[in-house]
Amino acid sequence: MTILASISSIGNVKSISKSNNLSSLSNSSSSLQSMNSIQCGGCGNGGLLGAVGGLVGGVLTGTGVIVGSVLHGVGSILTGGSNNCGCN
């Protein structure tokens, strides 16, 4: 009886972690869309401005996307924002 109870509780933990992963994936995809909307606009908005927008978007939408926005921000600073034509 206790073995069955422990197995069922392990199954519940796995399903909870799967649902958490799915929700974090949906949060990251929506934040990526919001980051793309921040980057939309004319060409060469300036690398620093794009980096700040990406960092703020990452912080506001969740911790899972901060790494991606930091990397994107560093890339924008290095390239000077010259490839920010339209929506990236």
Swiss-Prot record:
Transmembrane intervals: none
Coiled coil: none
Superkingdom field: Eukaryota
UniProt family annotation: Belongs to the hssA/B family.
Protein name as annotated: HssA/B-like protein 17
Species of the source: Dictyostelium discoideum (Social amoeba)
Lineage of the species this protein comes from: Eukaryota, Amoebozoa, Evosea, Eumycetozoa, Dictyostelia
